[in-house]
Amino acid sequence: MKLFPVGEKITFVSRQSDKKSEDMELLERSIRRKDPGLEQVFLCKKLEGGIFSKIGYCFHVFKQMYHIATSKVVVLDSYCISVSALKQRESLVVIQMWHALGSLKKFGFSIVGEGEGRNAKLADVFSMHRNYTYILTSSRVCAPNFAEAFGYDDKHMKVMTLPRVDKLTDWSFKEDCLRRI
């Protein structure tokens, strides 16, 4: 896919839902205000159980591959096989904006091989959580948990709350909520 030129584009990828998360919508608005010419692509497709869903998702992976190959930045909110399992160009910036607030429960490499975790061999074959440039964490306190879960060292951790948390500290949002109550 390196045949296609890289554009002024950011691609958001999610397996959590078939629609944009609130965090993605808030980022989209903020980016549009700051850089209206930047193309934003949203590839949101929930990976469901069942063979037909998985076959359908395989076709979606090709779409992901194209947009990842032609983007300067990719933002994820969960594991993405197209990012992790395939070789990426060095200039690609991949940001893991994990969908959960904080690290209350264990996930990723923290539970590989355990009951609720992935099989260690599968995690290795699918290069689970590879090729990330930055991993967003809500605080320095959570950073070691995220580093363990994603298998990265501290230099990849960036303390930055999710956009929906920023919304809670926005006075106009609070005033609007009070008016509606």
Q: For each predicted feature, which ranges?
A:
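Short, solvent-exposed loop/turn segments at secondary-structure junctions
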Residues: 16-19, 47-49, 80-82, 100-103, ...
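A nucleotide-sugar donor-handling region in carbohydrate enzymes
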Residues: 105, 110-111, 117-181
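Tryptophan-centric aromatic hotspots in well-structured domains and transmembrane helices
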Residues: 20, 42, 94-98, 150-154
